[in-house]
From Swiss-Prot:
Pathway: Amino-acid biosynthesis; L-histidine biosynthesis; L-histidine from 5-phospho-alpha-D-ribose 1-diphosphate: step 4/9. The gene is hisA. It is found in: Cytoplasm. It comes from Sulfurisphaera tokodaii (strain DSM 16993 / JCM 10545 / NBRC 100140 / 7) (Sulfolobus tokodaii). It catalyses: 1-(5-phospho-beta-D-ribosyl)-5-[(5-phospho-beta-D-ribosylamino)methylideneamino]imidazole-4-carboxamide = 5-[(5-phospho-1-deoxy-D-ribulos-1-ylimino)methylamino]-1-(5-phospho-beta-D-ribosyl)imidazole-4-carboxamide. This is 1-(5-phosphoribosyl)-5-[(5-phosphoribosylamino)methylideneamino] imidazole-4-carboxamide isomerase. One of its GO terms (cellular component) is cytoplasm. The active site is at residues 9, 129. Belongs to the HisA/HisF family.
Amino acid sequence: MLKVVPSIDISEGKAVKRIRGVKGSGLILGNPVKIAYEIYEEGYDYLHVVDLDSAEENGNNEEYVKDICKIGFKWVQVGGGIRNVEKAERLLDYDCSAIVISTLPIKDPKSFMDIQKIIGKDKILLSVDYDSSGYVLIRGWKEKSIKVLDFLLSYDSLGYIFTYVENEGTKRGIDNNVKNYVIRIKGLKEYAGGIGSIEDLYKLNEYGINYAIIGMSFYSGSLRGIKYVY
């Protein structure tokens, strides 16, 4: 079974949906807490939240994250700019279910290991933001780092979120190569980037993905209302 997880990206106090991560592109949706509550009222019990400003080291939106975590979702995973133990613990104190980390293991392995040691691997999801060349992208998807497979072999966590950045926010379809990555790992397997149709969801389920994170296809209505595929 594949579970569908709506996403909320927050920038400057507003829920947004960017295209390929480019600031100013895509949709401005409004108050993120209101959007989250609407999602909850529609019967979704899992949510993916990203603080874009914190990720870009240009402020933070923690007050909205805190309020979203109080709504009543069974599971809220939060990412964006988590670079130290203090922030990781603070987010967990807000009752978020897990934190999402991407750049830190590559740029500052010691800080990552400190976080892992204190809060535990079972509270950390690693986001593998990658391109068609098979490299992990960091620093706002502007810098290539290491090969995806090298990354997967280097770290352990609750699970991995595979984000295919070239199709993020486009609804152009998934990256079928993700099936070659998920077979290498244990734990939760999540995917984001380009999901635009029910066929994409069926493929991801076939590949062994547990959660499909949807943004543009949710807010544009093409996949809104779908919660599972089998």
